[in-house]
Amino acid sequence: MESKSYTWFERRRRTKALDLAQEQITKALDTVTLLHQATKKMAENKRKEAMQYIENIFKVEKEVDKLRTEVFKELSKGVALFAEYREDLMHLVKRLDTLADHVKDAARCIKMLGDAEIPKEFWENTAHTTSFLVDCAHALRGSIEKIAVDSVAAIEGAKKVEDIERKIDDEYLKTKALFIKHGREVDSGSMVIFDDLVEFIEHAADMCADTADYIVILASRE
């Protein structure tokens, strides 16, 4: 997984809170890549490999939670940053933590569906959707990096996130349509869980877009 240095943070006085926040944001976005790899492996019927990615998601998400707690602990000391930037940092950390939560919930659904008989088209569509989610996360990562050094680029990156999120909305509807096409081939329990999987991926995309909206606000201040 790649590790980035967010220039917006570099312009502030180096603190433990900023170091922890950078790591938390990076790991939260990394969970999206792991989810895509898991859905790809399910589409290829490589279930054992898919489950390895799922376990990695659970591991990374726990690290994200731990880092969030440590960031808030540092920020509560009151001297980590000026109040305005402390608030900005908390909002970013909360949003990315929620994103990782949605990815974890999607991963749980995949784990439950590990032995279920699911049409290949379901997994192929889902893998296609998560590929867009990876694009969304990469655009979000780039936008965060540009907040301080190039506010125009940061805003453009945020708009790119929203454009990709709309594509995910389209894929969401296509996948839902498969429920009708293959309804008689899938047992009701598996269908309910797959529906949850699709919803959690959509929630993750929505959180990317929500974070992008907040980045526009931050970049406009710079």
Where are these regions (language model features)?
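Cytosolic, long alpha-helical scaffolding segments
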Residues: 1-222
